[in-house]
Structure formats: C-alpha cells, structure tokens
C-alpha cells in the first residue's frame, strides 16, 4: 500500500493517488492478467506504476473480472488526507484483445499510441468534452493528457510483441459524482475527469482548486470577454437571479486575486464581481485571498468606514461586537447607503490597482444567505 506523507505546520498529512494513477494501475493489471504475464490471478493483489513525479506507487486491486478476450480490473481511488469527492470511487479498466485491423480502424476515432497497438476510450462515468478550450479536444473522453500518457506507457512496457488492445476506462459512480464537480461548468458531461499531472494527490490541494479556476476562465473567455466573478454557490445563484447565465459566471472561491490575474492573462475585457459584504469588505482594503485564516478583517472595515463618516463611537463598538458582517448589517438597518457606497468604491479602486487598470471592473455587494438583498452596485451609479 502506498504511504507517503508531507508536513503541514505541526501536522503530518498522508498523500494519495490520482484518478489518472488508478486508471493506469487498473489498465496495467488487466493487461498483465489478459496475457498471462503472472502465474495466477490470486498473485496479483497489488500493482505498481511509475508516476511523472518519479515516485513509484503501489495500489491494491479491489476486484477482477475475467472474460474470454478481456480482463477488467478495479482500483479504489485513495485521496489520502485530501478527502475529495472522488475518495473511494471505483476506477475500472477493461482491456480487450483486438486484431491489428481493428486497432488501425479504431485508432482513427479513438485515442491511440504512435504505433497504433493501443487504443483508449472512456466508458460509463467518464465525462465527455462538449466545449472548446480545455486540455482535451471536443468530443473526446475527459482523460487528461498526462493520464493518457501514463496508461499508454505502462501498457507498452509489458504488452507482448504483435499484440493489440483496446482499453476502456470507466467509473461506475462517475455519472452522479461528476455533477458535483466543476465538470458541468467546463462543458464536460456524463461523468468525472481522469486527472493528474504528477500522479500523486497532495493534501491541502489549493493548487488543484486554482487550476480548476484558471481552466474555467480560459474556457469561458474563448466565447465571452465579459465575465462575472463570485465566491461560491450562493453568489452564483444570486448572479442567476440577476439575469446572468452560467456561461459567464466563474466561482473563484477565496482566490479573487488569482482569478483577476487569470482574467488579465486570458485577455478578458471586463469583469463584474458579485459577492457578500463579508468577503467584499476584505477586498476594499487590499485582501485578495479572502479565506478567514488569511484575512479576518470584515467588521473592522465597517467600523472604520462608519468612523470616517462621523458616526458615534458607541455605534462603531456595537458593530465591532457583532460576530458577522451579516449581523452588523442587520444591526444597522436602513439609512446607511453612504457606508456601502464608500466601501464599494474602495473595492473598485483596490481591484483596479491590483490589475493595473487592465480590466474594466464593476461590483455588486449584497447580504443575506437564503434571500440575498442588494446593498450596493456600481452598475447603478
């Protein structure tokens, strides 16, 4: 069993392996069994693969199905201490013997290696790409370039001479799980993606989230140079209630600065940021990672702006004693339009400074979770 750890502060966190590694291991194991490259099925309890990181990964084989001309192996996705949505998913590879003629014909429409002895496709639960701008061409299975290379390389290393195989990667629960990932937003339908650039899942996968944000901006900016940035599902729903459509909305989580940088690099012309005052107030004073562990100022922004407007210190203290911005807004009640306007203008100035005025920027700020209520919008100025 694969055991690798990284240090995170005072904690020791266990790494896992990607869906790409699972697919590779399952495909290699199935090929070995199909061509009797081991003594018996019982002997193959684990499979070892090389990863692009140069780290060897051993994975247990969950179960095997042997047919007349095919073998199917299943490996369970293991995410280590990064408990993502794919943890425990069955990743299956079915490897089938085919003729040279079949391989040549299939290679015209499926993924294949240079010598056309291996053809590769996605089965049930592996998404299909329906839009341009991704790492995989429109119409192809969502098996990313590195996992493709890994699968082909491992099979090439063991496939007997003058033998040809068709490899199908499937994820039985992938159709449902795929709906809960970024895939529908990216135009990947019908399942999950087979991913991984290193073969290893590292806990605290901030990089993976950023990569998804970058990819979504790249893909959506191909057809739309005016995008909407928001922080999460609540913001997305509010955007839709305002009439915006999914094709122009980007969920950037806490990484607003990173998302702005991606918009600039993708030649986006304008962005509208839509967010709850709790997140937006942080941007007003230059915080472009809005996670509470990175920046906790929210009530302090409201308190400072109230002070600058000349409000009594007793009111300022009441705001500071609230637990959330939501509570502070409700405490204040109506009649504080200038407060939200001043914060809003500072949000715009802060963002424009961040991108060196390379983007036209507007902002919408609201409060309320179940029923968002507009506090300020530069679009109405």
UniProtKB/Swiss-Prot annotation:
One family name in Pfam for this protein: CbiD
GO biological process annotation, one example: methylation
Catalytic reactions of this protein: Co-precorrin-5B + S-adenosyl-L-methionine = Co-precorrin-6A + S-adenosyl-L-homocysteine
EC category: transferase
GO MF assignments: cobalt-precorrin-5B C1-methyltransferase activity
Stored InterPro entries: CbiD, CbiD_sf
Alphabetical list of SUPFAM superfamilies matching this protein: CbiD-like
Pathway of action: Cofactor biosynthesis; adenosylcobalamin biosynthesis; cob(II)yrinate a,c-diamide from sirohydrochlorin (anaerobic route): step 6/10
Keywords: Cobalamin biosynthesis, Methyltransferase, S-adenosyl-L-methionine, Transferase
Family as reported in the entry's similarity comment: Belongs to the CbiD family.
Name by which UniProt lists this protein: Cobalt-precorrin-5B C(1)-methyltransferase
Organism whose genome encodes this protein: Clostridium botulinum (strain Eklund 17B / Type B)
Record gene name: cbiD
């Amino acid at each position: 069993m694969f055991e690798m750890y990284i240090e995170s502060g005072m904690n020791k966190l266990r790494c896992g392996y990607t869906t790409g590694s699972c697919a590779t291991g399952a495909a290699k194991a199935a090929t070995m069994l199909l061509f009797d490259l081991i003594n018996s099925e019982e002997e193959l309890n684990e499979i070892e693969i090389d990863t692009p990181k140069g780290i060897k990964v051993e994975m247990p084989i969950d179960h095997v199905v042997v047919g007349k001309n095919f073998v199917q192996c299943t490996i369970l996705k293991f995410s280590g201490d990064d408990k993502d949505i794919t943890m425990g998913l069955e990743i299956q590879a079915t490897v089938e013997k085919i003729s040279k003629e079949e391989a040549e014909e299939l290679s015209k429409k499926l993924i294949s290696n240079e010598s056309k002895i291996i053809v590769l496709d996605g089965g049930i639960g592996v998404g299909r790409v329906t839009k341009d701008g991704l790492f995989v061409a429109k119409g192809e299975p969502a098996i990313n370039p590195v996992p493709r290379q890994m699968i082909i390389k491992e099979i090439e290393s063991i496939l007997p001479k003058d033998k040809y195989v068709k490899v199908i990667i499937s994820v039985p629960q992938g159709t449902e799980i795929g709906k809960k990932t970024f895939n529908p937003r990216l135009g990947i339908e019908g399942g999950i993606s087979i991913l991984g650039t290193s073969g290893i899942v590292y806990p605290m996968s901030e990089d993976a989230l950023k990569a998804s944000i970058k990819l979504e901006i790249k893909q959506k900016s191909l057809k739309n140079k005016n995008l909407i940035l928001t922080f999460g599902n609540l913001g997305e729903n509010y955007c839709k209630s305002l009439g915006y459509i999914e094709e122009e909305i980007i969920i950037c989580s806490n990484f607003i600065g990173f998302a702005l940088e991606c918009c600039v690099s993708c030649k986006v012309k304008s962005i509208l940021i839509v967010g709850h005052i709790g997140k937006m107030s942080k941007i007003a004073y230059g915080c472009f990672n809005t996670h509470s562990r990175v920046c906790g100022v929210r009530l302090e922004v409201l308190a400072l702006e109230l002070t600058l407007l000349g409000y009594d210190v007793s009111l300022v203290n009441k705001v500071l004693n609230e637990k959330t911005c939501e509570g502070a807004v409700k405490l204040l009640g109506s009649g504080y339009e200038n407060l939200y306007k001043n914060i809003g203008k500072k949000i715009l100035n802060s963002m424009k400074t961040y991108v060196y005025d390379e983007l036209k920027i507007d902002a919408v700020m609201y409060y309320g979770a179940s029923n968002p209520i507009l506090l300020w919008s530069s679009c109405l100025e």
